[in-house]
Amino acid sequence: MGDWGRADYLSRHGIKDARVLEAIARLNRADFVPEDLREEASADSPLPIGHGQTISQPYVVALMTEALQLQGDERVLEIGTGSGYQTALLSLLCREVYSVEIVPELAQSAREVLGRQGFENVSFREGDGSLGWPDQAPFDAILAAAAPPDVPLQLLSQLKPGGRMIIPVGPRGGTQQLLRIQRALRPGEVPQVESLLSVRFVPMTGQPLSQG
């Protein structure tokens, strides 16, 4: 059973992309949370999924997905598979999803959940999301569900010219900014950066990010 009520709620709270709302309506968030939290899955709030990680607030998931402006033929890199809920949503909205998760237990769990539900256009990789997935780059879009302290140039370099990245950036444990970054069309031009929302995401772990 999907979340038709959630899609209606999100529509009334500012999410306008009909494709995003339809995809959310097709998914049941309770399928992606620990069994003892399934009764809480209907709430518009983040929930713990173990190993210090969370499944994000549904409104934030929808906002991030809408900001990618997916049309259906994109190749998308996801940093932080987590529960697999965001992965499933992206899978319904683009051609291919490449998802990286650093926590082995979460990577395995998400792979199993999405496999049971028949998602076939998702490739998984266990490892350091701060490095992206260089051998599959470039991507039309990148979505990160963990926050580095600064904009990671390693990930930005894996976008196609004109590609979009949605990423929370800011201090560990503090308020971060959810950014929409569009890579310039021509070498030497400055990317376009827009702040969408103040958020608090788990930190992006892994090796230090290269800034040049």
Curated annotation (Swiss-Prot):
UniProt-listed InterPro entries: PCMT, SAM-dependent_MTases_sf
GO biological process assignments: methylation; protein modification process; protein repair
EC numbers on record: 2.1.1.77
Reactions listed under catalytic activity: [protein]-L-isoaspartate + S-adenosyl-L-methionine = [protein]-L-isoaspartate alpha-methyl ester + S-adenosyl-L-homocysteine
Subcellular localization: Cytoplasm
One Gene Ontology CC term in the entry: cytoplasm
Pfam families tied to this protein: PCMT
Catalytic residue positions: 56
The keyword Methyltransferase is annotated on this UniProt entry: yes
Superkingdom as given in the UniProt entry: Bacteria
Keywords: Cytoplasm, Methyltransferase, S-adenosyl-L-methionine, Transferase
GO molecular function, one term: protein-L-isoaspartate (D-aspartate) O-methyltransferase activity
Biological role stated in the UniProt entry: Catalyzes the methyl esterification of L-isoaspartyl residues in peptides and proteins that result from spontaneous decomposition of normal L-aspartyl and L-asparaginyl residues. It plays a role in the repair and/or degradation of damaged proteins.
Family: Belongs to the methyltransferase superfamily. L-isoaspartyl/D-aspartyl protein methyltransferase family.
Protein name, as recorded: Protein-L-isoaspartate O-methyltransferase
Gene name, Swiss-Prot/TrEMBL: pcm
